[in-house]
């Protein structure tokens, strides 16, 4: 009887001393446009009891669809910091997901030469077909006031400063 009691006490001590839910880290940084899943195992050191756990958003304006978190009205979470928690019954373990944009715009076309008329405005996107989840802007120092051949660098940027430079003549 004393042996059984000792085993029960030891089991309770071992179970009671375990930390249970342990996050891999307090802040997770994810690239803009990447899926942010509501799967607890992605954020835990030990996923032994993950079937009873749930990832919940603590930030407003976030929807959960198909086990993914996204900004309301979008297919992804926009750039920013978001509060989440792993819920285990009535206990919550908070963490942050930081969404960053570090990727430059992508150009569908690689143009090396263009011809424009004197005084013509240039629609750079019609040549490069650049895309980025954060939008794109074009910057080029070109003079179309007279006929000439020019070597021009076109800087294609997103609103977070990521850019790519294309050379055209």
Which functions belong to the PLM regions below?
Residues 1-4:
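Positively charged n-region of N-terminal signal peptides that target proteins for export
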Residues 10-11, 100:
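Residue-level signal for mature regions of secreted extracellular proteins and peptides
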Residues 13-16:
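C-terminal motif of bacterial Sec signal peptides marking the signal peptidase cleavage site
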Residues 18-60, 103-135:
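Solvent-exposed, low-complexity, repeat-rich "mucin-like" stalks and linkers
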Residues 27, 92-96, 111-113, 165-169:
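Well-ordered beta-strand positions in beta-sheet-rich domains
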Residues 48-93, 133-168:
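Serine/threonine-rich, repeat-prone extracellular segments and beta-strand-based repeat modules
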Residues 97-103:
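Interdomain boundary/hinge segments at the C-termini of tandem beta-sandwich modules
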